[in-house]
From Swiss-Prot:
Record Gene3D superfamilies: Rhodanese-like domain
Reaction catalysed by this enzyme: 5-methylaminomethyl-2-thiouridine(34) in tRNA + selenophosphate + (2E)-geranyl diphosphate + H2O + H(+) = 5-methylaminomethyl-2-selenouridine(34) in tRNA + (2E)-thiogeraniol + phosphate + diphosphate; 5-methylaminomethyl-2-thiouridine(34) in tRNA + (2E)-geranyl diphosphate = 5-methylaminomethyl-S-(2E)-geranyl-thiouridine(34) in tRNA + diphosphate; 5-methylaminomethyl-S-(2E)-geranyl-thiouridine(34) in tRNA + selenophosphate + H(+) = 5-methylaminomethyl-2-(Se-phospho)selenouridine(34) in tRNA + (2E)-thiogeraniol; 5-methylaminomethyl-2-(Se-phospho)selenouridine(34) in tRNA + H2O = 5-methylaminomethyl-2-selenouridine(34) in tRNA + phosphate
Stated name of the protein: tRNA 2-selenouridine synthase
UniProt-listed HAMAP family: tRNA_sel_U_synth
One GO term (biological process): tRNA wobble uridine modification
Span of domain Rhodanese: 12-136
Length: 365
């Protein structure tokens, strides 16, 4: 018989299957990768029990809970829990704090399905605290270096060739710029933090103690970099990636036009996907309207519209280079040049993609 679990580190390192007893509304606010939500109560049932608890106390709330989850409902949920337990005999169950909900499910599984299934002591809150501490400890104990560079130099491409990268944009499902929103949604803030911490945990378990990050702002789309990490990023040494203007334009064309359009088409089909892609590009330009200024915004938006019309009509993408070149020369490059000057004393190396990659690999030896 397996015992209830307190070894949170091994749970995440081994990707142990877990079922979450919390209500859907709790699960949506934050969960762990791969965990299955099989709630004891629906959102409405949980709300009723919570109100009863406040007004009449714990005993009355427990009685109401048993009344709400009974008969056919109870049998259906018990079947789902038992199916998970049989499919994942090495797994665990948990609720918010390792309290009544997980105890009740554990008891019902044992008494009515004949399955002894362990739970996680302390529940979701204990697991979440462990992951927050994991990130904090890494910031305190590990070595970090940032990769910076003008827009389109291929920072993400370089990072993906390293085994000690913490991919903030990947975890946030966002490219980091005003145009960085993907076709699929970003994770909830807590999910972003949890994935980041698990990534750090697994890499440290492999002996990695030096991490490479892209030089990001505090906000990556709608996800916020943990404060302790972001504060460190204001001081970490910086490696500056360089590339030609022409290569940068082509890379942006690839990422923000060709690949983004393909993402939308894959999700929504040809016609709707192309329309949503066009709307996304125009909205991204609109998001920096004030920073561009009226005249520049109108000019670049018109070039973008013409490019989108041509792409829709013939599939041609050449006209997109016009607004990309304009944005780089008139907006992104001056902004990044200013930021680089402000961080000049932290730049320990500069070079092209091959040179930067080799430098970072050597630095990690």
């Amino acid at each position: 018989m397996r015992h209830d679990c307190t070894d949170f580190r091994q749970l995440f390192l081994d990707d142990v299957p877990m079922m979450d007893m919390r209500a859907p509304v709790e699960f949506a606010k934050g969960a762990f990768p791969g965990v299955v939500n099989l709630p004891l109560m629906t959102d409405q049932e949980r709300q009723k029990v919570g109100t009863c608890y406040k007004q009449q106390g714990q005993a009355a709330a427990i009685t109401l809970g048993h009344q709400l989850v009974s008969g056919t409902l109870k049998r259906e949920r018990l079947h789902a829990w038992a199916s998970f337990a049989k499919a994942h005999p090495d797994g665990y169950l948990y609720c918010a704090r390792g309290g009544l909900r997980s105890l009740i499910v554990q008891q019902w599984l044992r008494d009515e399905a004949g399955i002894a299934y362990p739970r996680i002591k302390g529940g979701y809150k204990a697991l979440r605290t462990f992951l927050l501490d994991t990130t904090q400890q890494a910031v305190e104990q590990c070595d970090f270096v940032l990769v910076g560079g003008l827009t389109g130099t291929g920072k993400t491409d370089v990072l993906h060739q390293l085994n000690n990268v913490i991919d903030l944009e990947g975890h946030a499902n966002h490219r980091g710029s005003s145009f960085g929103k993907r076709a699929t949604a970003q994770p909830a803030q807590i999910d972003f933090e949890n994935k980041l911490a698990i990534d750090v945990l697994k890499k440290r378990a492999r002996g990695i103690e030096q991490f490479v990050l892209e030089d990001e702002g505090r906000i990556v789309g709608s996800c916020t970099v943990p404060l302790e990490l972001y504060q460190g990023m204001q001081q970490y040494p910086l490696v500056w990636l360089e590339d030609s203007f022409e290569n940068r334009v082509e890379r942006i064309l690839r990422d923000y036009v060709i690949n983004l359009c393909a993402e939308f088409v894959a999700l929504h089909g040809e016609e709707l996907g192309r329309r949503l892609f066009a709307e996304r590009l125009l909205q991204s330009m609109s998001n920096i309207h004030k920073r561009l200024g009226g005249e520049r915004y109108q000019r670049l938006s018109e070039i973008m519209r013409l490019a989108l019309d041509e792409q829709q009509r013939s599939g041609g993408i050449d006209l997109h280079r016009g607004w990309i070149e304009g944005l780089l020369k008139e907006y992104y490059d001056p902004m990044y040049a200013y930021q680089r000057d402000a961080k000049a004393d932290r730049v320990e190396f500069a070079g092209d993609a091959v040179e930067v990659r080799e430098y970072l690999k050597a630095r990690n030896r």
